[in-house]
Amino acid sequence: IVLRLASADCPDAFSRPDYVIPLTSWYYGKQKWPFRFDAETPPFFMRHATNDSGYGFALSVKEKLLEAGVPLDWKTVDDGGHGAFEITVDGYGHDWTVELVEWMRKNKILKTDNHEKEVD
């Protein structure tokens, strides 16, 4: 549903998200590519494990986003499957959250540091 709302086929501009953060993907289940991305598609922060069964679909999404000129921050990991980005997982399962905050600041999605406390 997120890809549908982010696509050019979104029923109205108010339903379209400002950004998209898919951490794993899955095959949509249709033979024909169901999404159209364009200049109005919001930026994507994508992470995927190469050993996830949905990796091929994620590569298709990546290719279509790049063809449409959509801003994309893409990284993969080799292990972890569909649960590679659970924050309870050691390693990159924790690290991607720092990258996400930096990406959100860079894209002016996260505008303040109010969540950080000053230390004396």
Q: Could you describe each region identified by the protein language model?
A:
Residues 9-16, 49-52, 89-91:
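Short, charged helix-to-loop "capping" segments that act as catalytic/coupling loops
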Residues 28-29, 50-56:
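Acidic catalytic loop of the alpha/beta-hydrolase fold
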Residues 47, 59-120:
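C-terminal catalytic histidine-bearing segment of alpha/beta-hydrolase fold enzymes
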Residues 18-19, 55-63:
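Short, mixed-charge, low-aromatic patches
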Residues 40, 45-48:
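Short beta-strand/loop motif that positions the catalytic acidic residue
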Residues 24, 48-49:
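The conserved beta1-alpha1 loop
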Residues 1-39:
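Primarily recognizes the serine-hydrolase "nucleophile elbow" in alpha/beta-hydrolase
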Residues 19, 42-43, 71:
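Proline-centered loop/turn at the N-terminus of a beta-strand
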